[in-house]
């Protein structure tokens, strides 16, 4: 019912941002001609609305994987249908490009979680998976920001600011049946800037 509100940004400046991030991931720097992206030019982008491009196959895949993880996890029986719908089922987070992230992240992280934890405590499962994610050595950078990055790009680069880290965490947790969301400080009393993090 909310699909008409959701969209992905498109445009050549977004392609340039991805190139700059890929360069930064390798060398901690990027081409000087891309420095204009520090003040990301949203005005040059257009919105591609989900309702016009999303396929039934995409939605079915998302629904099937969502129900699969809800049913197969030991803590799934403690997750209400309402919480499932809000914190596991969604096919997107914000304005990121649509990808088959739920299937891809499931096959990437479900074996990891299975090797780390076999119990029924969702908080302990989250802790084990979060500790594993820390070992991936995420590279923090907040010079280049723009629309939300795709789940696949985050998995490939493991690079970005706290928004990207929270998005990655949300994809990872939801893909294995852990109900997760993102909370926000519009202004942190500690850092005096906005901050986001995952909640379970």
PLM feature spans:
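N-terminal accessory/pre-domain segments preceding catalytic cores
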Residues: 1-131, 135, 175
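Mature, folded catalytic cores of secreted/periplasmic enzymes
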Residues: 48, 53-56, 60, 138-139, ...
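Hydrophobic/aromatic-rich core segments of domains that either
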Residues: 111, 115-120, 125-132, 141-152, ...
């Amino acid at each position: 019912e909310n699909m008409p509100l959701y969209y992905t940004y498109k445009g050549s400046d977004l392609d340039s941002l991805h190139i700059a991030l890929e360069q930064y991931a390798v060398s901690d720097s990027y081409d000087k001609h891309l420095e204009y992206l520090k003040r990301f030019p949203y005005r040059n982008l257009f919105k591609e609305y989900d309702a016009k491009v999303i396929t039934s196959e995409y939605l079915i895949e998302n629904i099937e994987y969502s129900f699969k993880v809800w049913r197969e996890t030991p803590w799934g029986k403690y997750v209400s249908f309402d919480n499932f719908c809000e914190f596991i089922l969604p096919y997107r987070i914000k304005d990121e490009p649509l990808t088959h992230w739920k299937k891809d992240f499931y096959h990437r992280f479900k074996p990891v979680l299975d090797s780390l934890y076999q119990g029924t405590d969702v908080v302990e499962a989250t802790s084990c998976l979060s500790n594993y994610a820390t070992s991936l050595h995420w590279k923090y950078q907040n010079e280049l920001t723009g629309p939300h990055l795709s789940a696949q790009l985050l998995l490939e680069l493991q690079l970005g600011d706290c928004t990207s880290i929270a998005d990655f965490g949300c994809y990872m947790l939801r893909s294995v049946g852990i109900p997760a969301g993102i909370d926000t400080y519009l202004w942190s009393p500690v850092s005096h800037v906005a901050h986001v993090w995952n909640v379970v």
